[in-house]
Amino acid sequence: MATNFLTKLFGSRNDRLLKQYRKTVVRINAMEPDYEKLSDEALRAKTQEFKERVAKGESLDDLLPEAFAVVREGSKRVMKMRHFDVQLLGGMALHYGKIAEMRTGEGKTLTATLPVYLNALSGNGVHVVTVNDYLANRDATWMAKLYNFLGLSVGINLPNMPREEKQAAYNSDITYGTNNEYGFDYLRDNMVYESGDRVQRVLNYAIVDEVDSILIDEARTPLIISGQAEDHTAMYVAMNKIVPNLVRQEGEADPRTGEGVTKPGDFTVDEKSHQVFLTDQGYEAAERLLGHAGMIAEGASLYDPANITLVHHLYAALRANNLYHRDQHYVVQNGEIVIVDEFTGRLMAGRRWSDGLHQAVEAKEGVTIQAENQTMASITFQNYFRLYGKLAGMTGTADTEAYEFQEIYGLETMVIPPNRPSKRDDQLDRVYKTTREKYEAAIRDIRECYERGQPVLVGTTSIENSEIIDELLNKENLPHQVLNAKQHEREADIVAQAGRPGMITIATNMAGRGTDIVLGGNIEKQVAAVEADESLSEAERQQRIEQMRADWKIEHDKVSALGGLRIIATERHESRRIDNQLRGRSGRQGDPGSSRFYLSLDDALMRIFAGDRVRAIMDRLKMPDGEAIEAGIVTRSIEGAQRKVEARNFDIRKQLLEYDDVSNDQRKVIYQQRNEILDASDLYEMITVMRDDVVSDLVRQYVPAESMEEQWDLAGLEKALESEWRIQLPLQSQVQSAHAITDEEILEKVLQAAREVFDAKVELIGRENFTQFQRAVLLQSFDTNWRDHLSALDYLRQGIHLRGYAQKQPKQEYKREAFELFRQLIDQVKTEVTRVLMTVQVQSREQVEQATEALEQRSAHSLEHMTYGAPSDGDIGGSVEDEPLELPEGARVGRNDPCPCGSGKKYKQCHGKLS
């Protein structure tokens, strides 16, 4: 209460910032008459003037009013659009590294031109980040007219572009691209063998469009570049034949009484955590089935150490068959499994689930099973975007996630007021007992809208649900358009005309982003088609355009009079923000509109989180079938359930980041070292330091520091030098012939001998040629060991939560052990590189060149396969894929015995619970 009182008294921080920014808006507006008088050439010359002032030390903040005024004037001349004052406010928020929340239809794309232009003046490049290639291409092509007019270059960064084109795109003043492609380019740049092969410049400033989608929805999805690992294709096929013979248990047993199971079965499905667990009965059934299939020996246990990989494949098959559904979580396209993004409904071509899940789904659908992959490089979007010197974002829905943006990224969210107040009527949810009743009510609403000519956008959470609505509308003979991941290519065309009178458009979440739904239809697309028609004379073209605009005005006014665009949603999403995005399609720029959610107690969110409470209310009210409950208390109850899910997902993302920060720090060290190796013209000193460290470590194993001669093992040292580096050094005879010799002198003799062997190779081949070979060896060693290190960190993370049972802090233990693994990695690189360079037999420059080329080709081959990782289904550190427990050979642990790890849990609930 005290906080609310103070906010009313002094205004919120958002209000105070807006008040401060409005003073700058007044200054920009005052400049407008002067800039209107400038010729096109004089206006363009301002860009060069600004660049020179920045080069002399003037700050971008000082230039802001003038730069914004120039962009506004340029837009008026080229785009025929003038930035509203609220767009200037949004541009300032973006320049100052904030997230600007601007409602749908407020012109975020045009708003971004202001800070993009200003920050491009520094010459360090600006990256505009979009959610898909279509938007990157559209926005770059659209806005390039303005930027080029003002003297700035624009590049588009798309997948599969040749390296030279990517370099040109990144060297432009402004680069448009997707979050995935920027991240992949960063990883690829840190895997190249020639410095000239890198494409990115310094990561200076990025504006992330639809920032909530990229930095929150995708935060748990790492970008992964991977190479093929061992093939287990036959195993996935075999497991897919076994799983259908297992029966799902209905009901959940109470841990105290054992009651609650309505139908016993072999496995349970936990929809909240998105996991599957074998029951005791299922464990025995699986053993029996695997025994019949000859996959485990007679009398052997499924949880014997030798069968741990079987358990992994069994659980992958169970999850594929019971948690992942066709046309909801994935589609089958051209004989491949393509993941459907749960937040946008878009197809994620090239992305694969990890941990064998994707292969299990491929086996289930009977398509070609592709080999599993080993991670070669990875980074989360959270850590990639934190590499930028300055980061900003814009979206229509950020306020509900403002705390997370501040906590994780240090980004403040600023709500920009609309140019015109919204007239949308967001009606209370209607909740029905069954799915059938819900759909019947939604169809009635759609029919009523259609009969009066009001356009309708029907929102669904999955392709499956959109196809159900599609069938129902076909039965009712109601003409409509379907927009889901299967019609991705037609997205813009369908959405552009969704505001025409009588239009019915069914859409998954993907329709929420990027394209405005204009009442009366998108006239600009139609005008563009006429302007491109070369068969028309100029007079005919103008006449036709004028007629089209007049017709559009009639349709626009008609739709407005009918209440604008009607949003009908058939399910609540887990996130309030996604629901708000759907609502936000209606009521743009002060247009009228309305929205209504039709729900049932069978919906996933209701069933898992809020169904019992609402069902109890319905039973108390003795509501007949077909009647809906429509009350604020129900809507608030549903939003409360959504808040719980959002809080849980935030905790998962935050925990992921805390663990990933450890590997992120190590990644920075490795990539910095890699870049130094690539950029160095001579590596002799670096190799010398490495070699001396390795030689010293070896010598000290046989001749400890400050030790007596009696403690030395010179015979062992001679043998080690011969076997490790082919150095023949008669240390024993030298010591015997000397009157007195110290351990330091022994060390110096060995170092000198190693130096002479190495220098002889360098002299034979030539320093420059040998530098190339050294570079290839160093990079190959770093890459191989980094790849193995990433796998080791994954295994460590999966089992680290067990330390909690020993009263240890898992995160601290993870940091400590990860550091030790990293130290071992560095030592291993030094040892490997020294061994290769000391033992390689070279007789000519040609041999060195061939060896260098072979190393580089091996690296290039490993880059051929690239894929996405998928988000973890369990909490980080609490994943059900625990670190396998090593048991003595032949040892067997009963399912209900205490786990040998010492956790105090039963084996089936601890290391026996593998997926």
From Swiss-Prot:
It is found in: Cell inner membrane; Cytoplasm. Keywords: ATP-binding, Cell inner membrane, Cell membrane, Cytoplasm, Membrane, Metal-binding, Nucleotide-binding, Protein transport, Translocase, Translocation, Transport, Zinc. It catalyses: ATP + H2O + cellular proteinSide 1 = ADP + phosphate + cellular proteinSide 2. Residues 866-915 are annotated as: Disordered. GO terms for molecular function: ATP binding; metal ion binding; protein-exporting ATPase activity. Its EC number is 7.4.2.8. It is an enzyme of class 7 (translocase). Its cofactor is Zn(2+). It comes from the Bacteria. Signal peptide: none annotated. Part of the Sec protein translocase complex. Interacts with the SecYEG preprotein conducting channel. Has a central role in coupling the hydrolysis of ATP to the transfer of proteins into and across the cell membrane, serving both as a receptor for the preprotein-SecB complex and as an ATP-driven molecular motor driving the stepwise translocation of polypeptide chains across the membrane. This is Protein translocase subunit SecA. It comes from Delftia acidovorans (strain DSM 14801 / SPH-1). The lineage of its organism: Bacteria, Pseudomonadati, Pseudomonadota, Betaproteobacteria, Burkholderiales.
